[in-house]
Amino acid sequence: MKWKVQLYVGGTTFYENVHAVNRLDAIETAKARNPKARVIATNPDLSS
């Protein structure tokens, strides 16, 4: 499943789209790509 993780770093917010089985794996993947970022929101991406 695709997840849309909203991250915050350096005064800006941005989205990271990741493929993960569940919400916690999506957050872990997004944090691995952006270790200094803070997670704001995590939502499933239902668009095809």
Annotate each predicted stretch with a short phrase.
Residues M1-T13:
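Short aromatic-glycine-(Arg/Gly/Cys) micro-motifs in beta-strand/loop hairpins
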Residues V5-L7, A20, V39:
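Hydrophobic beta-strand residues in large extracellular and virion-surface proteins
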Residues T12-N22:
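A short, exposed loop/beta-hairpin motif centered on an aromatic-Gly-Thr core
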Residues Y15, E28, I40:
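Short acidic, gly/pro-rich beta-turn/loop elements at beta-sheet edges
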Residues R33-S48:
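Short, mixed-charge low-complexity intrinsically disordered segments
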